Amino acid sequence: METIKRTKIVDVLKSDAFGTTVNVKGWVRTRRGSKQVNFIALNDGSTINNVQIVVDVDKLGDEFLKPITTGASISVNGILTQSQGKGQSVEIQATEIEIFGTADPATYPLQKKGHSMEFLREIAHLRPRTNTFGAVFRIRHNMAYAIHKFFHDRGFFYFHTPIITASDCEGAGQMFQVTTKNLYDLKKDENGSIIYEDDFFGKQASLTVSGQLEGELAATALGQIYTFGPTFRAENSNTPRHLAEFWMIEPEVAFNDITDNMELAEEFIKYCVQWALDNCMEDIKFLNDMFDKELIARLEGVLKDSFVRLPYTEGIKILEEAVAKGHKFEFPVYWGVDLASEHERFLVEDHFKRPVILTDYPKEIKAFYMKQNEDGKTVRAMDVLFPKIGEIIGGSEREADYDKLMTRIDELGIPMKDMWWYLDTRRFGTVPHSGFGLGFERLLLFVTGMANIRDVIPFPRTPNNAEF
């Protein structure tokens, strides 16, 4: 086979260099035709669209073509021509074909038919070859690029925080432990507590639940930073919105108050949505047509108006009024409750009909590091609530006063020995600062319109599932 430099299918489909010889490589979506001519739909992952390969059966031979079935991988040399058929502007008249690998139709699971999301999760190693997951993962790439670009263009520094940590940012204790010890022969003291001094790190260590605390340290030196990395929560939650392993984006900015924080969060998420519409429209349109007919309208909708700023207390009043008028929620509504997704979505979808930034939460349901308001009951927290998703961003102005932070840590019984390094930033040149966390997969749920968070990450980690 003549050696010709490969052209990606996304570029072939845009080309008007008719009459030239091109080479494409990819995986066969379908092969159909007659005794005289075959049509191969070929895809290489660079685009949702296939290129049509027109094959003269007499020239290449029927026996040669038989192994070219759905899932087979091939290389094609051919003449680029204008297509006479519907659905494509160009096609390739094949002159040579090389078969890299075959896919037995009797065992290859991705035949030309519909597959359930549950089935595709069982073959997560193959599902990127489907149109749906090709689209999702191209969008995932573009969203990651947009995030880095947003912060880089605004002078933020990308800061790497540790995956293995001895601190629990959220204070929930739901962490995956890291050890090199034999779990069946752990040394314990007279009280039955495990002795960690002779473990690898000399202390109890876990996978991080957040890079925020370390990010705060960086912000008090570099001014404005962001983290973007994997986080881990050992929550036994089998819901369409939870993963045990996911990715978080966490900016932290010195000298920013809660108002600055809200403005940054709104600017950031609108930028990401606009980037998706500008750069991923083919894939978004496919997902809109296949899964969620309101996807594009919903994406465009969040860009139209400013997000509502709503104190938690006012939000509770709105929800209580809805209950009084007959609206039924599964979970109760009262001041002090940590709002459920149904409450958040009611505020966004039914009441305001646009994104809401809920602020000033009761301190009892928020983390120790959040700055308290003068009322002594609430903290300067903020959650960005989105249609279909509920909470998509959570953040706050951080407590910058050493004594107040010490008091709060003591109230919650957090061991001081684990927090000395964090407290040093309040002892030495403390400054007001704020930040937030965006769950990357929740952003992707919104942008793709997918219904389950397991379908926007390549290899989902959930209770009882750690395949691949």
Curated annotation (Swiss-Prot):
GO biological process: asparaginyl-tRNA aminoacylation
Coiled coil residues, start to end: none
Main location: cytoplasm
Compartments where found: Cytoplasm
EC number: 6.1.1.22
KW Protein biosynthesis (keyword) present: yes
InterPro entries: Aa-tRNA-synt_II (IPR004364), aa-tRNA-synth_II (IPR006195), aa-tRNA-synth_II/BPL/LPL (IPR045864), Asn-tRNA-ligase (IPR004522), Asp/Asn-tRNA-synth_IIb (IPR002312), NA-bd_OB-fold (IPR012340), NA-bd_OB_tRNA (IPR004365)
Pfam families reported in the protein's UniProt record: tRNA-synt_2, tRNA_anti-codon
The organism's place on the tree of life at top rank: Bacteria
GO cellular component entries: cytoplasm
Reaction(s) catalysed (UniProt annotation): tRNA(Asn) + L-asparagine + ATP = L-asparaginyl-tRNA(Asn) + AMP + diphosphate + H(+)
Protein's name in the database: Asparagine--tRNA ligase
Gene from which the chain derives: asnS
